[in-house]
């Protein structure tokens, strides 16, 4: 400023400096420019809400709206008469559920089947973790992709087609029995499906075959997010591949595994019914009937929709309590809740 002080205006103009140049002039120039407005958080929130809205509507229609059907638990509901033509019986069906010795004995076996299937699933929940780690260690990318594809595809096969595969292989006239008979190893067909022995383990094996590859996808994504500098530092220190898996990969997958484990504990009564519905028969019905299938059989086969509704209510309430308990345990263990 002192160098230009007292200079003639034409000299300043020749030097490319306007007489009003300086901090004040610059601020005036900037003031005349267009300001960039910060993004509107309200507009962004509305956009995100519109994106989520269809899923909220679907959740409301298929998860919350059916709860209105719980009112049938207080009626002797007859589908042909409708709710208006059915007799109001109050808590009669609740009393039937807890007062009938036969009903309680049957329900006890159903709960034993349900809990056994769930605990077997929890006991084998680490298999997708180990499978993802081993799959990640395959160096040939074409072989890794082929294995991942072949193990993921069964997840997209319906349980009806899975049973068709099982029947064609393991029925009395299936491929396995035919081959063993032709080789002279057996004279009487072996019963793989028409038997009550090892039903829980058989259902577990089919469930693992169908869902192992799909369950490993989330862990493969978690492995891809691990900081590679950890592996590089360990290699510099002389760590082997097994040590990398044991001390880096496996511990880094544990937070994901714990969350999924807590959710599986909360859903311990939700086994689904499709698998058990297609595999059930007169020989294995006692040990294959889980709670979801039992509710279906009571309502549709036994023609007692009101009692089936009572069972569904108990299941929903217990599942909600288990979810809240699992969330509290997760919050205490991890410092943050899962819901």
Regions picked out by a protein language model, each given a short descriptive name:
Residues 1-51, 139-144, 327-339:
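Transmembrane alpha-helical segments of polytopic membrane transport and secretion proteins
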Residues 44-339:
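A structural signal for multi-pass alpha-helical bundles of membrane permease subunits
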């Amino acid at each position: 400023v002192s160098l230009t002080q007292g200079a003639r205006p034409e000299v300043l103009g020749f030097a490319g400096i306007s007489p009003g140049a300086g901090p004040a002039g610059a601020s005036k120039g900037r003031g005349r420019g267009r300001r960039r407005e910060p993004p509107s958080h309200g507009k962004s929130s509305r956009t995100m809400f519109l994106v989520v809205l269809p899923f909220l509507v679907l959740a409301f229609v298929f998860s919350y709206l059916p709860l209105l059907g719980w009112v049938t638990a207080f009626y002797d509901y007859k589908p042909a008469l409708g709710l208006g033509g059915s007799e109001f019986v109050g808590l009669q069906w609740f009393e039937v559920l807890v007062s009938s010795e036969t009903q309680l004995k049957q329900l006890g076996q159903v709960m034993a089947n349900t809990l056994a299937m769930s605990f077997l699933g929890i006991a084998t929940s680490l298999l997708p973790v180990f499978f993802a780690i081993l799959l990640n260690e395959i160096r040939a990318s074409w072989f890794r992709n082929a294995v991942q594809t072949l193990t993921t595809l069964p997840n997209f096969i319906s349980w009806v087609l899975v049973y068709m595969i099982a029947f064609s292989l393991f029925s009395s006239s299936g491929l396995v029995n035919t081959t063993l008979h032709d080789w002279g190893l057996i004279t009487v067909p072996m019963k793989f499906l028409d038997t009550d022995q090892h039903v829980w383990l058989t259902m577990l094996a089919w469930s693992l075959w169908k869902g192992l590859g799909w369950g490993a996808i989330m862990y493969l994504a978690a492995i891809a997010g691990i900081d590679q500098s950890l592996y590089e530092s360990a290699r510099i220190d002389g760590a082997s591949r097994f040590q990398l898996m044991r001390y880096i990969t496996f511990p880094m997958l544990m937070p994901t595994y714990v969350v999924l484990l807590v959710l599986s504990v909360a859903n311990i009564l939700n086994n689904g019914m499709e698998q058990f519905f297609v595999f059930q028969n007169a020989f294995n019905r006692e040990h294959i009937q889980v709670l979801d299938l039992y509710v279906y059989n009571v309502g549709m086969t036994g023609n007692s929709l009101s009692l089936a509704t009572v069972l569904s209510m108990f299941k929903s309430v217990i599942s909600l309590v288990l979810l809240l308990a699992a969330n509290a345990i997760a919050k205490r263990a991890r410092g943050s809740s899962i819901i």
